[in-house]
């Protein structure tokens, strides 16, 4: 066999081979014998089918198996010559040429190797970090909100008129063209006025009503209403108000602290203020990281951490980005790409820079996660998806199964690891005073052993 291998750089190699047609044909009998042991053909006992008949009936399968066997032998010899093992590979080799000539085949393939990444410039990549420390005014604002959130609703006198932040219990029924419509009726329905639980015009119509009062009012559903059969329609609603409850004001003192910090043995207002300050600090930190610093850190990692990237993985990422882009394209654009191979190739090529950066950052994050022992457990992935489902009104089990079927769980896990690694690097660069605040709020760091 004529075999040539070339190591292009630390992450890429290429092979060129010319195995003979005779070499392929020598494999036919062995493969045909294996098939003959398994197949059953009328008139013959299992294992006694003539090879000539097997070769005729299963010619395509034999040819395919023989070619695959030959390619694997070519790769095995190439790996040996390169001095590499399967553990050194990243992804599968990409067969770029397989052509049959008169007496031989021409085979070419690109081989991706795990890159060598040196992390000695990480500190240079991390931008300076300074999170805003909450002042007394911000702390007091949050305390007032907590006092409101934890306040109980109590009954009001019969003369009270409904106002924003009151809790109402109502019956209602809606009609379109004098006929009730699906989803337009409820009894003993509760809502808090001003929370935008219902359409704004619906809640406005309830303002000023008194307990036991009944009211009719027109309402036009917005043109973009989520229930398409109601969008833009004019309706008439009949409402009966049963009960008005108002929040019982809570004072900002030790008693409030005991309610909010129910699991604390000695909760005081002083402790509550410390917790509020810490929580506001975490919120400020998350906002700064997500809106500014994480992207800046990624740009620095891309620019300053230099190493060879496996071409095969970049090509795979380009394919993925191209396929994902197709889903958001207009039908005429997709049709244009289908009709022109040149346009499709050009469109795919437009994703090269993004694909290269994505692959590079993934390798860097993976290396950092291993070095710092930062990981994400599978149950954390499921918790994240469960939360996503609850926030979007989806069935959690169905969403998780959808991710599993589409092989997307690994991508979610990697995204979570990336987020955790970036936050870890930025946290290390916080001023000492702010690191102390962070430690008080996070006694159990998010850094976990992968597994």
From Swiss-Prot:
One of its GO terms (molecular function) is ribosome binding. Keywords: Cell cycle, Cell division, Chaperone, Cytoplasm, Isomerase, Rotamase. The keyword Cell membrane does not apply. InterPro entries: PPIase_dom_sf (IPR046357), PPIase_FKBP_dom (IPR001179), Trig_fac (IPR005215), Trigger_fac_C (IPR008880), Trigger_fac_C_sf (IPR037041), Trigger_fac_ribosome-bd_bac (IPR008881), Trigger_fac_ribosome-bd_sf (IPR036611), Trigger_fact/SurA_dom_sf (IPR027304). It catalyses: [protein]-peptidylproline (omega=180) = [protein]-peptidylproline (omega=0). It is an enzyme of class 5 (isomerase). Gene3D superfamilies: 3.10.50.40, Trigger factor ribosome-binding domain (3.30.70.1050), Trigger factor, C-terminal domain (1.10.3120.10). Signal peptide: none annotated. Residues 165-250 form the PPIase FKBP-type domain. Pfam families: FKBP_C (PF00254), Trigger_C (PF05698), Trigger_N (PF05697). It is found in: Cytoplasm. One of its GO terms (cellular component) is cytoplasm. Its main location: cytoplasm. Its EC number is 5.2.1.8. The keyword Isomerase applies. One of its GO terms (biological process) is protein unfolding. It comes from the Bacteria. PANTHER family: TRIGGER FACTOR CHAPERONE AND PEPTIDYL-PROLYL CIS/TRANS ISOMERASE, TRIGGER FACTOR-LIKE PROTEIN TIG, CHLOROPLASTIC. Consists of 3 domains; the N-terminus binds the ribosome, the middle domain has PPIase activity, while the C-terminus has intrinsic chaperone activity on its own. Involved in protein export. Acts as a chaperone by maintaining the newly synthesized protein in an open conformation. Functions as a peptidyl-prolyl cis-trans isomerase. Belongs to the FKBP-type PPIase family. Tig subfamily. This is Trigger factor.
